[in-house]
């Protein structure tokens, strides 16, 4: 537990400018305003701190786009800084006193009065890079979808043969179609431009996928997540990149809520209306949480129902559907269960049995093929069977051999 500082600084920051309100808290029962500084350039923030702020201080920063980078800059200069949620001062704003310096003042007073019960967690430099890779993959996929829709729209509008859904062969097939149908003029120029952009994004997505796969290969915790049915290496990477430290979640349900799998419950008043606005009517989730984790684990839930129906989790899902439950709700419920299992894996809890060992080995062989035999040999690995056996030994090596009666069917 750190000692309380003498000075408390509230900071309201924007993309280029920031304002700080400095409070002297040497008298714990009577904090007083020390100084206010407005319209500070972010580039000159450290120099301003060195001239005006005592090292025995804490800076309270409202959560925003650049708050994590500001915290790192202050920490590197020797100042303590913490990030708080943006709603900390929501009830303290006044219609006639809304400005940056008042927000900075309210942040400092919120800390002094004990209204801040926790700080926002910020990732390490390594995991910040992992998140950047995940965001780059997400943005590339979005741009590919937009371009694919534009190509489809143009072909439909002009009466050309509609492209296939397979991204890998789409460009080559459409270029052959341009030659065969003798498309000319501006339509040809526009279509070729769209295909060129789509091909560039496809190559970028392939490079990012390979990079993610190699990161997962070098991270034992991410590899252990692959023992879950329906979870591919991108889902394992997205979850671990978002979590980093699983011990900040005291229970599995808190990790599930963080991953976006907090169900809408029957409530009243503003809470219910807010949940409906975020999640939509008749949707199973409340719309909060990390969308990247939610996407991959919802996809994992669909995979369990379609390809892993003979597993224990798949049988449970189909039992719920046969009882009349909505398929979407069952998919979300399976995704939530997978996140619950992930919480135990990330914390290092031992695998309970060998029921999924053969499934894990098959998954490791597929993962080996994803990276490619040539690259795996360059990284120092043997054949795919040797790789699968070695990884399975790390996960299941200390467990007793399963008997035929107790072994779970894992046809996935």
Question: Where do the model's predicted regions map?
Answer:
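Gly/Thr-rich phosphate-binding beta-strand-loop-beta motif of the actin/hexokinase/Hsp70
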Residues: 2-25, 107, 238
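Nucleic-acid-processing active sites and adjacent nucleic-acid-binding tracks
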Residues: 27-56
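Short alpha-helix plus adjacent loop in nuclease-associated cores
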Residues: 82-122, 272-288
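A short, charged helix-loop
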Residues: 108-132, 173-183
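Glycine-rich, often acidic, oxyanion-interacting loops/wings at catalytic, nucleic-acid
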Residues: 138-224
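Phosphate-backbone recognition surface of nucleic-acid-processing proteins
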Residues: 224-227, 233, 238-323, 327, ...
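Low-complexity, acidic/Ser/Thr- and charged residue-rich accessory regions of DNA metabolism proteins
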Residues: 317-335, 339-412
């Amino acid at each position: 537990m750190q000692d309380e500082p003498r000075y408390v600084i509230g900071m309201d920051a924007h993309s280029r400018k920031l304002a700080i309100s400095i409070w002297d808290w040497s008298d714990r029962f009577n904090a007083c305003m020390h100084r206010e500084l407005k319209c500070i350039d972010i580039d000159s923030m450290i120099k301003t701190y060195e001239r005006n702020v005592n090292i025995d201080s804490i800076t309270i920063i409202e959560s925003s786009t650049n708050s994590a980078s500001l915290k790192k800059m202050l920490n590197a200069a020797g100042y303590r800084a913490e990030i708080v949620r943006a709603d900390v001062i929501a009830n303290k704003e006044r219609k006639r006193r809304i400005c940056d310096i008042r927000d900075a003042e309210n942040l400092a007073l919120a800390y002094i009065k004990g209204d801040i019960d926790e700080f926002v967690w910020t990732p390490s430099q390594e995991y910040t890079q992992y998140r950047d890779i995940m965001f780059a993959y997400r943005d590339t996929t979005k741009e590919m979808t937009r371009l694919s829709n534009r190509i489809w729209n143009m072909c439909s509008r002009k009466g050309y043969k509609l492209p296939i859904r397979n991204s890998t062969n789409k460009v080559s097939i459409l270029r052959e179609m341009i030659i065969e149908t003798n498309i000319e003029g501006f339509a040809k120029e526009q279509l070729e431009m769209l295909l060129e952009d789509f091909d560039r994004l496809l190559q970028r997505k392939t490079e990012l996928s390979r990079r993610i796969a190699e990161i997962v290969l070098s991270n034992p915790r991410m590899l252990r997540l692959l023992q879950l049915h329906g979870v591919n290496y991108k889902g394992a990477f997205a979850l671990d990149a978002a979590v980093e430290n699983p011990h900040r979640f005291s229970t599995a349900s808190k990790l599930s809520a963080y991953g976006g799998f907090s169900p809408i419950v029957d409530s009243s008043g503003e809470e219910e209306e807010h949940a409906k606005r975020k999640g939509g009517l008749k949707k199973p989730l409340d719309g909060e949480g990390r969308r990247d984790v939610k996407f991959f684990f919802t996809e994992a839930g669909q995979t369990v129902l379609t390809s892993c129906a003979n597993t224990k989790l798949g049988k449970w899902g189909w039992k719920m559907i046969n009882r009349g439950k909505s398929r979407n709700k069952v998919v979300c419920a399976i995704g939530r269960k997978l996140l619950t299992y992930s919480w135990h894996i990330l914390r290092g809890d031992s695998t309970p049995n060998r029921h999924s060992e053969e499934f894990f080995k098959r998954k490791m062989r597929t993962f080996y093929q994803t990276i490619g035999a040539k690259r795996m040999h360059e990284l120092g690995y043997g054949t795919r069977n040797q790789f699968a056996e070695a990884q399975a030994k790390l996960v299941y090596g200390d467990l007793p051999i399963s008997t035929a009666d107790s072994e779970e069917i894992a046809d996935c």
